Each structure stands twice: as structure tokens, then as C-alpha cells.
Amino acid sequence: MTTPAGNTALKAARIAAGYPSQQALADALGVGVRQVRRWESDVPPWPQPEVAQALTRLLGQDLESLGFAPGRGPDRGRRAVLPPTAVGLATVPRQAANMQPATAAEDYCAVTCAHRRLYWSVAPATLHPAALSHAALGCALLSETAGQTRHRIAAALAETYLLAGRIEFFDLRDPGRAQDTFLRALQAASEADDALLGAAVLAHTAFVPGWSGDREAAAERMVAARTYARRGPASAELLAWLDAVEAECETRCGDTRAALRLIGHGEDVIASGGGHPSPEWLDWFSPVRLAAFKGNTQLRARHLPQARETLLGALEALGPEEAKQRSVVLGDLAAVEAADGNPEEACAYALLALDELERTWYATGMDRVREVRRVLAPHQHRACVRDLDDRLYGWGTTVSAIAR
């Protein structure tokens, strides 16, 4: 005598949505595990309306596709209404069709992590289209997944859009396009209900008005970012990074005193530590990066001895894989020496920055070198400045600047 297979449709949908056990689904729904066992039996009872809506939302399929027959309970309609998805992202399927297995989330997240690491070594113009293609895949997968599987893909999609937006803003110098991409990242973070990712995206959106001198708009976005950070287990580094972002916006809007106060607060936050670890995607910030922020702010505030000391400490602490940040710090050190009337030392640091840029291109680093060259205009007849020009406008640097 064969054992009844039970409601295999519900079981398959449960596993595909990332709930490997009946208990896991019961916990997600807020019902007892015995109820889930009854649903996965040969004759599953029709769920109550509120539970039915939650079940279809979690598993991404209507009740009939999940193996329930209307005749076994009150007629609740052929399909439970599913919540709308954020604008620009894929919608949840309303019937069983091409549902991906739970492993789809692991596979998609693996590529997202690879892109995160590649950002620090691959040319932006090469990585950017790959990130956008990966985002398009993530949007498609949202319509073919549900539950925890969909949740994980949405979070990885938010990170992918954030990476693409960072490339557009910091590397390709296209703030308008970056703003649109950050919006898509925020929508995906909403789908994942990931408050910390939302905080990170919102803080990045503050760079757009902040770098153009719109202090009010930048401040408003930072308030939103901090609000989202309070909703999750924010690490000390994430909170300090929010201080650093706001400090950079204040600096670019001309208030270096406020910026230094914010950086001081960030240093205190890191020193006090915290019980929450930083998320894996927060790989663009560390105490060393905070020191680099501080050195740049001291430079703009004309605190030259302090800026020199801070930047030299940051340069010494940077790891070998941090070529992009090294080019920025070297550029700032060159600016310190140029402002302090030391053109020879300024050119030496600028040449070191160009060495880093030849290995790993970074538009922000090149901007620092060009700013130094403008300051050195009164010394342009000196041999050190002519040597800098030969490197700055050499074939390799010029082609890299245009191609990337």
C-alpha cells in the first residue's frame, strides 16, 4: 500500500521560497506547525482569509496553485491579492509559473559578492555594464521567487544597484544617472525590508546635492538615512560613516567647522564600539577611511599641519588593495604641500598618486591631482611642475581618463 504524497505543490513552493521545514513556514506565518502539516496533507483545508493572504504573499502563488481546492472551505476568491511591488522592479507572480528553487538566491548573491570585490580592481567602464546586467537578472528573478528566497534576492539586487550608482557617481562622474540608480536601489531595499541597506542608499543620495552645494537637500536626505539606521542593528562603523558622509557634504557646502564636529563624533562612535557587526557590503569604510575624510576636511579648513599629520597616518594604514583610496590620500597630501608653498613636495605626492591611478583608475583621485595642478599654476615654469605635466598629460593617463 503506497503512502499518500500529500500536498506536494505546497511543499515544493515552501522549499523554493526558502522555508526548508514546516516549522520555518509556521514561524513566518505566525501559526502552529500542526496547521502547516494539515495544509501539506492529502486533503488540505482552505486557510482562513488573513492567513491565506499571508501565505500567498510569502510563497508568491495563488491558493489553487498551492494545492488548495475551493470546495474544501469557504470561497475566498480564486486568488489572494498580493502587494504591489516598487516601481521599476518586477512584480510578484499571481500564479505558479517558472518558480525558481531556493538555491537561486545563493547563486545570485554569490555574483553580487564577486562584483563587490571586483570594484576595487576592475576598470569602472568594464564592471558597470556587468553590474547593470546582473541587476536586470535580479529584477527578473523577483518575479520568479517568493518568501525568504525573494527577500535575499531583493537585498542583493539593492546592493547591485548601489554598486552601479557608486560607479556612476564616483567613477563615471554622472550624478544624474547615479540619482536614478540610487532610487532603484532604494526600491529594492524596500522589497527586502532591509533598513540598513536603505540607510546606506539614502546617504549616497545625499552626495548628489551635497557635492553641488545644496546643503538643505543633502541634510534632508541625511535625516532620512539616520532614521533608517535607527530601525536596524546598525554597527559603529555604519553610524560613523553616516557622520563622514554628512561631514563631506558640509565641507563641500563651506562649513568645515560643522564637518570637523561630525568627524569627531564619528571617531567617538568607533572608539566606543558596539555590539553589532558591520554588514558585508560596508566595504567602502573603515577607521582609516574616516581619517582620510578628516584629513581632507582639515585641508579645506586650512589646518595644514594637522591635515599633513592625519593624511600621513591614513596613508601608512591603508592596505595594499586600497589603491583607489591611496590615490585620493596622496592627492590630498599634494594639496597640503601646494597650499603650504612646497611645490617640489606637492609634485612628488601628485606623481605617486598618478602611479596609483595607472594601476587602478579612480576619477575622484584624478580630480585631486588636477586640483593640485591648478594650485601650482604660479610655479608652472619649474622643472618639477613640467615633469608633473608630462605625466598628467601622457598618453597612458590621457587615454585612461577618456576611456574609463
Question: Each predicted region: which residue ranges?
Answer:
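Alpha-helix N-cap/N′ positions at the starts of helices
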Residues: 2-9, 31, 110, 160, ...
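Residues in the recognition helix of alpha-helical DNA-binding motifs
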Residues: 13, 28, 39, 69
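A short, Lys/Arg-rich alpha-helix, primarily the initiator
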Residues: 1-20, 24, 53, 64
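Compositionally biased, long intrinsically disordered regions
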Residues: 57, 64-110
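Conserved binding/catalytic microenvironments
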Residues: 99-105, 109-404
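DNA major-groove recognition helix of helix-turn-helix/homeodomain DNA-binding modules
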Residues: 30, 49-65
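Recognition helix of helix-turn-helix/homeodomain-like DNA-binding domains
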Residues: 30-47
